[in-house]
Amino acid sequence: FIFLHKYTTRMWIDKQKTINLQLEMPVRLSTYRKGNAIPPLPGTNIFHSTELFHVFEMTRGYEPLLIVAYIGNRPVGKLLAVIRKSVRLFPPAIIKRCEIYGTGEYFDEAQNKEDLFGEILEHLTNEVLCKSFLIEFRNLENPLFGYKAFRKNNYFAINWLRVRNSLHSKAPYERLSMSRRRQINKALRNGAIMEIADNEKDIQDFSRMLKKAYSSQIRKHFPDIGFFRLLAWQNPEKELAKVFLVKYKGKIIGGSICLFSKESAYLWFSGGMRKTYAFLYPGILAVWAPITYAYEKGYAHLEFMDAGLPFKKHGYRDFVLRFGGKQSSTRRWFRFSWKWLNKLLCKFYI
């Protein structure tokens, strides 16, 4: 049977739901919209962490929500989603979209993760679909996980590509193409240096530089400048993120931001002044810096966050593959708030 129990504990926990899930004990779902309401939670996945929630919460233009599943008072799973504005070239020009990186994090091996995710997914969809034009699940570790739940909640999948560099079997330099080796060596000989940002001014200068680089790519979303500062300084006791800089004669000409979670590093944003300083290859060094750092720190993989669609030529994917990574197939799941549009796309893609 299904036992429902709704109540409000605090004003910022706007919905709690109790379900059975064919488990011995009922599961309660809580939605947190304010960081100071979130209790201490287990977990090591940065994309569903309280730390990343705080970064989104303090960054202009983002609205995070964290759904936590409990059995009794014990958390057994959580999922972090964030709503942001998106500017499009076609109507509607400005929309709100909800993005989720992965499918959550789960702590009780005795529970059926697929069933638990299905309940969290239904809860999330009901929570955000009224205020988001689009819900997107991206960067899935296992593209098959949750298939039944996604389809039950009227999501459709689009095939995507994933690019990862292995760091555990051989040195990154050995994986580079010959042309990439020459470019890196030439840039370093010409005076370019790579370092980690350790002060406020460098992070601000890096953010402004990267924003200009992204402004020429209309489809690329770029967060408020404060996002990078917050991410870099959030919880210094943990290695959550690093800002890598490429400098020439003291000026920042390139850089990247990399997240760290479990045994993997994730390159989120990168870029450089490649036209002005072409002979220094700042865009290449901006990628090379986190690769070498992750290798030296013992991470097993470095993943590029957006490798693109499999049936479309993608300049960035071709660029990063020359660092020795391998591409594999994955998917992204989407749900539109317009029922007629979502139904049409479900028929087309399913």
Where in the sequence are the language-model features?
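Short, high-confidence coil segments that cap the C-terminus of an alpha-helix
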Residues: 62-64, 129-132, 241, 296-299
